[in-house]
Amino acid sequence: MVNTDNKENEPPNMEKAHMDSSNALYRVQRPLQRRPLQELSIELVKPSQTITVKKSKKSTNSSSYFAQLHAASGQNPPPSVHSSHKQPSKARSPNPLLSMR
């Protein structure tokens, strides 16, 4: 009878210990989950700004690299591609204005 009492008493004690530990872990995990999200959002914003600056500075390097890719693929060189991209963007700006009027 003593053995059965011990066995019956052990599972609730173990469950209570698990409940306490899970609550403690849950309490610890919540702030840990919140903090990295804020830090990550800040970290993700900063590199994007530095990358845009790098792109503007290295535009000649990237264009030469793309020129090699376009030459290899047999498409038009990048200057004509860039000019064609600029023209539609100018044509697109009046279109929304006309459609809104």
Swiss-Prot record:
Q: Does the keyword Transmembrane helix apply?
A: no
Q: Which parts of this chain are annotated as the region Disordered?
A: 1-101
Main localization of the protein?
Answer: cytoplasm
For this protein, what is any one GO molecular function term?
A: ubiquitin ligase inhibitor activity
- Indicate, by first and last residue, each region the UniProt record lists as having compositional bias (Basic and acidic residues): 1-19
Q: What induces it?
A: Preferentially expressed under nitrogen starvation conditions.
Keyword annotations of the record: Cytoplasm, Meiosis, Nucleus
Q: Which GO terms describe its biological process?
A: meiosis I/meiosis II transition; metaphase/anaphase transition of meiosis I; negative regulation of metaphase/anaphase transition of meiotic cell cycle
Source organism superkingdom: Eukaryota
Compartments reported by the entry: Cytoplasm; Nucleus
Which Cys residues form disulphide pairs?
A: none
A GO CC annotation recorded here is: nucleus
The extra comment attached to this record reads: Expression of the full-length mes1 protein requires the presence of the mei2 protein.
Q: What does this protein do?
A: Specifically required for meiosis II (MII). Binds to slp1, an activator of the anapahase promoting complex/cyclcosome (APC/C), and counteracts its function in promoting proteolysis of cdc13. By suppressing the degradation of cdc13 at anaphase I this protein may help maintain a sufficient level of cdc2 kinase activity to complete MII.
Q: What is the annotated quaternary arrangement, including any partners?
A: Interacts with slp1.
Q: What is this protein called?
A: Protein mes1
